[in-house]
């Protein structure tokens, strides 16, 4: 009898794969391209109304942006993300309206040659294939037909300057897990909005309050936020005359300041400031849309509004001696 010895070799097959390296792509020129919108000369007496939507002229052509992905990129598809720091206020017909400022909401649609129409903000949208992606060569970011809609939430009066601000920052990546760290292009806006509706405040003259000489030690004795002892608030009545604004309209006046701390306008001496209040002494908080003095126009589209003002210590520290001034602006809005 023969005995056979069998040797059983058992093994586990090992499969080695080469995973695609996730990468963050950049603008081929080295810096992000900015697509800019000028909001000047957009509004008229007809569309300067709450709820009105104004569509800006379409930027129908290609945005003209090329991107390049870094060494190690092995795929030929990309994702795009459209990020905004502005809050979404509402969605209407797929358009996501962002709060641009106290007067306007804004929304956009963008068309990609492969992905079609989409409505930012939105992250990691899968786009088409371009074989330059994996070869570290420039490829087109195929965005076009940019549609920008503006919605009025508060009508303008007089002139309002809209400082330049970024609406969307656009990133190109090769996976949905990549950090959104290197912008490829941005979409921004600014403008100077001037409308037929206007109100003249104090006949266009500066409203001045002069409190004379005040002892420096009185401010530190009063403490932060308080008026020095012996200083009396001053009262003035402001005449307002409106044009192209309906008689009997309900309006409001608020305070804007170059530098503010709480309820005070900070002066050119940082330890000192001024408080402006309504006729009853309730302070206005500078640069706060909800802090206002409501008033009612008469049959001649005019009104008279009382305000009070007084100096205060901002820090509670004894200030340096010398004159101090602060400048603010009285803005009239629809209430």
Swiss-Prot record:
Listed GO biological process terms: cell adhesion involved in single-species biofilm formation
Keywords on record: Fimbrium, Signal
Extent of the signal sequence: 1-22
GO cellular component: pilus
InterPro entries per UniProt: Adhesion_dom_fimbrial, Adhesion_dom_fimbrial_sf, Adhesion_dom_sf, Bact_Fimbrial_Adh_Pro
Main location: other
Subcellular location: Fimbrium
Entries under PANTHER family matching the protein: FIMBRIAL SUBUNIT ELFA-RELATED, TYPE 1 FIMBRIN D-MANNOSE SPECIFIC ADHESIN
Family as reported in the entry's similarity comment: Belongs to the fimbrial protein family.
Function field: Involved in regulation of length and mediation of adhesion of type 1 fimbriae (but not necessary for the production of fimbriae). A mannose-binding adhesin.
Annotated protein name in UniProt: Type 1 fimbrin D-mannose specific adhesin
Name of the coding gene: fimH
